[in-house]
Amino acid sequence: MTPTNIEAIFDRSLPQSPDAERCVLGSLLLTAFLGVNVLTRVSSIITPDDFAQDSNRAVFEAILELDADGIMADLVVVKQRLRDKGLIDRFGGGAYVSGLV
């Protein structure tokens, strides 16, 4: 491969899958509901910038913030955090977050 072809590979945008993003978030919310915290492992692989959809990025950031505060990020707590930040109505309200699980 010539250098130009290699550069072209890295200039392409990554594939996006809103469904996969929602599945990751739903899994995090469900495991928190069960009292299991898998966020440490997930956050070593996925960052907020990996989410193409702003709504999903906001939910993931809320989960990370809650975890940093020592709070288990279940569905109810995440919705409240987004409400407190004035973000929940930007992407469909609590119904959107509830729909992740």
Predicted regions mapped to residue ranges:
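Noncatalytic partner-interaction/assembly domains of nucleic-acid and motor enzyme complexes
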Residues: 1-101
